Amino acid sequence: MRSLTVCFALVFLSGGSLYAQKARAQNVPEIPYDSVPNLIKLPTGLYMGEAMGVATNSKGHFYVYTRSANTRLFEFDQAGTFVREIGPGSYGFEFAHSVRVDPEDNIWVVDEGTNLVIKMNPAGRVLMVIGHRPEAVAGAVATSNGPAAPAEKYTLGRPTDVAWDPQGNIFVSDGYVNNRVVKYDKNGRFLAQVGSEKAGNGPTQFSLPHGIAVDAKGDVYVADRSNHRLQVFDNNLAFKASYDNIGDSWTVCVSPGPHQYLFTSNSNPNGNAPGTWENTGEIYKMELDGTILGRFGHASKQFGGFQVVHMMDCRDPNTIFVSEIESWRVQKLLLKPQAAKTSAGK
């Protein structure tokens, strides 16, 4: 059996504040990978800003939800050629956070600025809206300085991500304000929640639930970012487990198929304070029970490294798409798990 040790790092950020990056497993096999060069081909005059979300559909196309001068949703084909922009000028687009594609190829966007989770069909037509956008007459939209929404059944507060179980139930990580996970049925009717407006570090509490995924059994995996862990719940949102040896879990995804894998990113923090790169940046590949199989990647501004991984897609467990905030890019990673090697002490 592989022996894993853990380490704990404290780093002082600019201005003197303390960044505590929780335990990371050591002696973990490094999974080699290639990053596809020149992946995205945008038309002349069209630009991408911060890449907040990325998701693939059953045809191999991928969607990017980006913050530029305006929040925009782009579609690209398998080769990375631009296909179209979806919903330009949409009332639901203000401050992009995540995009996901469900098993029927419906497109879901999670917008932190409008407090909305929006379901669209493959053609881009709106089918469902969860949440409520603050009215313009009430002041700023729900950015960091905007109004905080109450933790009501259908009112979200800077939500972060969305996922579904095999029955079509919807799970939303209602992240920056409400510190909870909410379960709705396939028609958007409230069923249950875990967590509360007040952040906490108990087994049913969150401090910025930033990403969410559901496996084939209906278990729910939550990237509990500011608590430096990943929490696992059953389908009724009862606590099952906590994985706290993977650094700061920013995003999580579960691959489909008969053998599902769990991926989570220990993303380097915004701002890249001195010392943080040495302890952050990698993505972990795990069994659903928390067993770490390997890791790949590192913090870097260069191609092939990661500059604040925000979301990822693992429809194919050996082809991982990552969206990065501070490099304004999406990378397509081709993993080589059979060539993984243990690098002690890294």
Predicted regions and their residues:
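Eukaryotic scaffold repeat domains enriched in small/polar residues
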Residues: 21-346
